[in-house]
Each structure stands twice: as C-alpha cells, then as structure tokens.
C-alpha cells in the first residue's frame, strides 16, 4: 500500500496557485503542500516576506523545473504606504528610526513623486532581506546588528497607480505596483519617503499577481487541505511564452530529446514552449539560428 501511495504521489505534476496568508513563510507553505498532497518534490516560485499575503505559485513534481520561469516573471502588488514614519526594516515590523510631520503632503505631491519612479530604477536592497553579501544573507547580518554596504540593483517599474490618498500628520497612500523580478516594494516606499523628505514605510502589502497567476483565482490553504484546490497543468505556467505545437511522431521524438524541425523567427536565446496538440507541455526549447534547441523535456 505504501509503495502504491508513493507511486501515485510521484505522478502528481502541476502548479498550485495559492494564497499565502500573513504570518507564514514561503517555505511553510511549501511544507504544507507536501503534507497535503503527500509529495516530496515541491517548491515555491519567489519568496514573499512572512508578513505579506498574496499569490504564491507552488510547483509540484516535474513542474518544479518551471519554477525559475515563474520566479523570473513580472509581479503585481497592492501596497499601503504610511508617510512620516521610517523604520529600520522599511515595513511595519521594524523599529521606528525617524518621524516627521507630513501633514503638508497632498495627493498631488504623492502622484508627482510616483512619476519619478517609473521605468528602470536603482534600488539598494534592505538589510533585512535574503540577498547575499560575502556569502551571508543580509538578514543574518542584520540580526547581529551588522550593517554592510550593498550594491544598488536595477529593477523595472512598469506601473505605479495611486488609488487613494488619506491626508493627515501620517498620510497614507494606496497604490498598485507592477514590477520586475527582484523589486522590493518596501524599498520603493522608503525611497518615496526620502524623495518627499518626510520618511515612509510600507504598512501593508498583498501580491496580486505572479506571472500568469492572479489573486482572484488563488486557493487558500484550507481549500487545499479539503481537496478543493485545483492542480493546474504545467503549461499553465507559460503565460505569454512563445509556443510551437507538434503532434504525432514529432511529439514522440521531442519526448526522446529530439528537437522539432521547425523554423522560428524569435531572437536567439528566446525560450519557446513545445506543446502537444492537446496543449500539454512537452519541452522547453531555446531559439537558435532560426531553429530550436531543447533545454528541458517533460516526458
């Protein structure tokens, strides 16, 4: 019986679009998935801070080989930023390091500041983060009271939309953010506060999208435990990735590691999904000289 269960578990391949609750780490969610599905192979696709809720896709079985593609996709967030208070962690969980009366701030001031953070920007990673410096995680150094120099990183802000603004001594702005992988929204809040010369911190954050996975379709952990969460096929992780469809003998050859004899017009290095006629993911390939070179086969 145990062997049969293990064999059944090994056949579980797909992606779960989950709603991570605040208070759990991303690794906690992965452990929950392993227990709920009885699988050993599972992994998340981009860390969410423990205090942050939102979309956390978890890959299971052979779909874990797709994790890097989801992790590298754009993300969307809804954020609450409180002005007039800066913290050492740049969010509401740290110690207050500076305060200022920000009652003079207007909606127009914040809207203008947001325009200065569109497009490519440089961010210095916060000390309380998983970034490594000299082989050490920054948060490990921060726990010891050590602060080190961090190199700025270039990220891309696709959209910053001011949804609402609440004035007062501690004004609050509600914004939607669409950004590239590696963007720290709490650092964005901190930098907005510096730009407006009043200080600020991220007081609330929820991730509303990770690649093709959206909050409205995310399942709770309670739904997963009750067997009500849908395990999506690996192809669901592809989003708008270019695709080539093959069938018959060509599909069988792909599963044996032979690239399909097709011409593509994508630039060299572009990742292309090779799918069967029924939409099932067969392989990931790379455009190479007008043809395809297989990189990962999902046979």
Swiss-Prot record:
Catalytic residue positions: 49
Residues of the PUA domain: 241-299
Alphabetized GO MF terms: RNA binding; tRNA pseudouridine(55) synthase activity
Keywords, ordered alphabetically: Isomerase, tRNA processing
SUPFAM superfamilies linked: Pseudouridine synthase
The UniProt record lists the keyword Isomerase: yes
Gene3D superfamilies, alphabetized: Pseudouridine synthase
Catalysed reactions, semicolon-separated: uridine(55) in tRNA = pseudouridine(55) in tRNA
tRNA processing in keyword set: yes
GO biological process: mRNA pseudouridine synthesis; tRNA pseudouridine synthesis
Domain of life the protein comes from: Bacteria
Pfam family, one: TruB_C_2
Family assignment from sequence similarity: Belongs to the pseudouridine synthase TruB family. Type 1 subfamily.
Annotated function: Responsible for synthesis of pseudouridine from uracil-55 in the psi GC loop of transfer RNAs.
Protein name as catalogued: tRNA pseudouridine synthase B
Source organism: Symbiobacterium thermophilum (strain DSM 24528 / JCM 14929 / IAM 14863 / T)
């Amino acid at each position: 019986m145990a062997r049969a269960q293990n064999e059944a578990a090994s056949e579980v391949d797909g992606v779960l679009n989950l709603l991570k609750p605040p208070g759990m780490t991303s690794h906690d969610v992965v452990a929950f998935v392993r227990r709920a599905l009885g699988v050993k192979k599972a992994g998340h696709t981009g860390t969410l801070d423990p205090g942050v809720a939102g979309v956390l896709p978890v890959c299971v079985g052979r779909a874990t080989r797709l994790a890097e593609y989801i992790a590298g996709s754009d993300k969307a967030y809804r954020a609450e930023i409180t002005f007039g208070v800066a913290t050492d962690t740049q969010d509401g969980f740290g110690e207050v390091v500076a305060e200022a009366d920000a009652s003079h701030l207007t909606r127009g001031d914040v809207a203008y500041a947001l325009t200065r953070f569109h497009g490519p920007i440089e961010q210095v990673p916060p000390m309380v983060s998983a970034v490594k410096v000299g082989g050490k995680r920054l948060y490990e150094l921060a726990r010891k009271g050590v602060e080190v120099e961090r190199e700025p990183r270039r990220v891309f802000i696709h959209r910053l939309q001011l949804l609402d603004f609440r004035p007062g001594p501690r004004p609050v702005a509600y914004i939607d953010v669409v950004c590239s992988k590696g963007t720290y929204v709490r650092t964005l809040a901190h930098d907005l506060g510096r730009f407006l010369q009043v200080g600020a911190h991220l007081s609330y954050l929820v991730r509303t999208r990770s690649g093709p996975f959206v909050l409205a379709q995310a399942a709770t952990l309670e739904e997963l435990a009750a067997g009500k969460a849908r395990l999506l096929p690996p192809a669901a992780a592809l989003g708008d990735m270019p695709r080539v469809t093959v069938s018959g003998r060509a599909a069988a050859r792909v599963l044996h590691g032979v690239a399909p004899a097709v011409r593509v017009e994508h630039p060299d290095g572009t990742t292309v999904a090779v799918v069967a006629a029924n939409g099932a993911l067969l392989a990931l390939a790379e455009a190479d000289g007008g043809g395809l070179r297989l990189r990962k086969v999902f046979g």
